[in-house]
Amino acid sequence: MTTPSQEIYAFMHLSLSDMERVLNSIRMIEGTTDEYLKEALFRDAVISYVKPFSRNRGEFNEILQLQQNLVPKELQDEHEEIKGIRDKLFAHNKLTWEELIFGPGTGFTVKGYEKVYLSRLIEPLKNLARKVHAAIMNEMSEIKKNGL
């Protein structure tokens, strides 16, 4: 890459791939009854969705990150919940002591995340991926129109 706008364009293209991966993982979830596979695919979808919204480093642009304005207002709460699941359980262990529920012995659960596969988030995650994908396409068109 030779220019900052080319770097942003490449980042946007990679972000499109992430949204497509989300949709592919959800398609696979909808086609299986295997609970373990559903959890693994859900984890993949969540991580792939949040990745471009996290802080990525560029050569020309110190931070490459999708902007919040690409998330539809009506799905903002679900977006934040999905980011929280990724940050607290999948990518990091950012749990507070209040969230941990200890049982007998060494077993414990995480309050609110008793089961990692949250089927109620499948449709919102699918909608988010589709709408963010469309918004990224618009952003990429603008970048191309203004010249790489």
Place the predicted regions along the sequence by residue.
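Short amphipathic alpha-helical segments with coiled-coil-like heptad repeat character
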Residues: 91-103
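Long, charged low-complexity segments
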Residues: 84-92
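Amphipathic alpha-helical interface segments
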Residues: 1-81, 101-148
